[in-house]
Amino acid sequence: LIPRHDGVEHHLAGGDAVRAIVDVGRPPGAGAVGGVFLGDPGGGLVAQLQRNEYIRYAREVARRGARAWVLTGTASVLRVDVLRKVANARRDGALPGSYGVYDTLALTEDNELTLAIKTLGYRTMSPKECIVRTEVMLNWRDLWHQRMRWQRGALENLRHYKLSKVTRPYFVQQGIMILGMFAMWLFIGLTVLSAVTGSFQIQLLWLAIGLIFVVERIVTVWKGGYKSLVIAVPMVIEFVYDLFLQAVIIRSIFDIVSGRQADWYHPTDGANAAVESVPQPSASSESQDRVLTAR
């Protein structure tokens, strides 16, 4: 097993975590174990919104039987023999990229490696005992650049892997996000239109449905304590956050369609941050022209 982590704090070495790693990693079908990531403490409203988001994601992973959507770069443990198979599959053209474990031109290398491992027939797991903490962005600018990389990287990974049994759930996930985006803006538009035309009415049915949404938002972040609840209860705060994330989706799709150059953005402790351009990720058919290294 090879550990891989880049987070501020990780708890994969605890007794419960080690036992969980061994239990889920022992079967031949398990290719890697990733941590269930939560947000680092500190920061203001932007940081707390991310912590709420990560708490809900951890809950979702647990409800899926500890099956990981993505092997988090914060802390993961990977089988050596599986990584060798990934590298060989890249060399043979069965996976995107050329010889190496990581596709170093992928914007989201951890997501890409997850797809690679699953494509070879292995499971990726995230046991609830393997809690890790990752940094949160402290301002909207840093969060925008981070999520642009995540969203665009995820879309480009799917474009390279194409539709398959492995990628189908990811395509469905992206489709649901896009449909949800249209539904939300339709709701906003109809609400504004009814208010302008004077036809706006409060109906008990929709109030009841809204109450269900409020309860869901509260229950899903209950473990986060009062700070999480203060953000979740009003709903409007997280509603604005959802609109922000939807703007990321729209811009990511636009950048891909227009062929805009992707950027790596590195937030720093100071006021300045570095941005560097990276080569556009290529499909597997172009892998011979790429210079990739195994990490």
Predicted regions mapped to residue ranges:
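Active-site nucleotide-sugar/metal-binding loop of Leloir-type enzymes
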Residues: 1-6, 82
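Nucleotide-sugar-dependent glycosyltransferase catalytic core
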Residues: 135-152, 231, 268
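Catalytic core of nucleotide-sugar-dependent glycosyltransferases
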Residues: 52-58, 142-164, 214, 248-253
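Catalytic donor-sugar/metal-binding loop of nucleotide-sugar-dependent glycosyltransferases
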Residues: 106, 111-133
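Membrane-embedded multi-pass helical conduit in multi-pass membrane proteins
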Residues: 176-260
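Short, intrinsically disordered terminal tails adjacent to the first/last structured region
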Residues: 273-295
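Long helical/loop segments within the catalytic core of UDP-sugar-dependent glycosyltransferases
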Residues: 22-106, 148, 159
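Acidic donor-binding/catalytic loop of UDP-sugar-dependent glycosyltransferases
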Residues: 8-24
